[in-house]
Amino acid sequence: IRGGSSLTASNDPLIVIDGVVMSSGSVEGLSNPLSSVNPTDIESFTVLKDASATAIYGSRASNGVIIITTKKGKTGSVKINYSGNVSVSTRKNKIDVMTGDEYRDFIINNPNATEAMITAVNLYPGVNTDWQDEVMRTAVSTEHNISAYGSVKDYLPYRVSFGYTNQNGILKTSNFERYTGSVSLTPKFFDDHLNMNLNAKGIYIKNQFADTGAVVGAVSFDPTKPVKNDNNKFGGYFTWTTDNDPNG
């Protein structure tokens, strides 16, 4: 927020959620505390980046502070809200490379091609594999959020919410899945002279990271080879072995 202030230490801002200070290591397996918050649960989002940040939180706020306040219950009858969306992601461009037939003709007509190279490209006649299409996809993602809020008589406002996010990446097998749940109670006692805030949040995140090296491999891999062949060594998938066996 305030610009990098250290060459070796973290330059991440301090994140405060409902008065609780969160750091990148405060939740095991969660690199960014912001991903633990359902966006539909956020009431306000405040950024502090001047001297007031360090005055309140000390040296921990040297990189600025992000203060998040989540929604609370309101007095009145029960109200239920639902929101959802579906999004579609696709690659913007495709790198133009040779087809299997073009590459096969290029090798056959190359005076410097060896007999082994010509044999390799003719191993699967007519095969034209577009490896970019094999590793990329049009990704469909969904998000659903439902919440209920109200109060028990006038002294116990409450809010309960549940959210589900399933985000697919354009690289096959990449996926982000998140379940969030929260309960907020804000009871009032002694004619509103005593107010309490009770918050409980739960989150389950499942990340599946795809091998980004597959993008480079898809551009450079031999288009004359099929995705699958009759070799069961590698689950039926074609692959070059360490001895460069063109039979995979």
Residue ranges, per PLM feature:
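Extracytoplasmic beta-strand/coil segments of soluble accessory domains associated
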Residues: I1-D18, S44, T54-K74
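Short loop/turn motifs enriched for small/polar and acidic residues
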Residues: R2-G4, N85, N199-I205
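Residues embedded in well-ordered regular secondary structure
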Residues: L7-A9, P13, M22-S31, G64, ...
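Short acidic/polar hinge/loop motifs at secondary-structure boundaries
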Residues: D18-K49
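Short acidic-hydrophobic sequence patches enriched in Asp/Glu that either
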Residues: V37, R60, K74, N175-E177, ...
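Surface-exposed extracellular loop regions of Gram-negative outer-membrane beta-barrel proteins
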Residues: V37-A53, T142-A210
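Outer-membrane beta-barrel translocator/channel fold
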Residues: I203-G236, W240
